[in-house]
Amino acid sequence: MTEKTCPCGDGKSFDACCGPYLSRASVPVTAEALMRSRYTAFVRQDISYLRTTLWPKNLRGFDEVATAKWAAENHWTGLTVLDVQKGGAADREGTVLFEARYLSGGKLNTHRECSRFRKKAGNWYYVEALAH
């Protein structure tokens, strides 16, 4: 992966992929695009984007300092999308199963999660991690 390649693993350049979302120039039109952009936000330590794309009712429990610390302490090495259920441009809800790989304390780890997303007023939001 080069600096110009988007960290989300979609194969596009950052400017043609998640860059417009993180700069707030546009919004993701699918749940998968939002999930990929949130992964990229972790890689780039853009905690305000993570907060902005969190389901509004869950904002109270969001710990910005702890999230920033965790993002900074880990070196993100890759993302693999395993499954997508709904979450298209015409949907209001969807789920994305993924694996995010990262180095922490010299050890390679894999975070596997099935994320639930919901769309409100044309914007997708991360709601929660589901049991999988």
PLM region descriptions:
Residues L50-T52, V127:
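Short, hydrophobic secondary-structure boundary micro-motifs
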Residues T110-H132:
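Short beta-strand edge/turn micro-motifs at domain boundaries
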Residues K12, Y21, A100, S115, ...:
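A short beta-strand motif that forms part of the nucleic acid-binding face
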Residues M1-S37:
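Short, low-complexity N-terminal intrinsically disordered segments enriched in polar/charged residues
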Residues R38-Y49:
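Short helix-adjacent coil turns
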Residues C17, L50, F117:
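Hydrophobic pocket/interface hotspot
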Residues T52-V81:
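Short solvent-exposed beta->alpha transition segments
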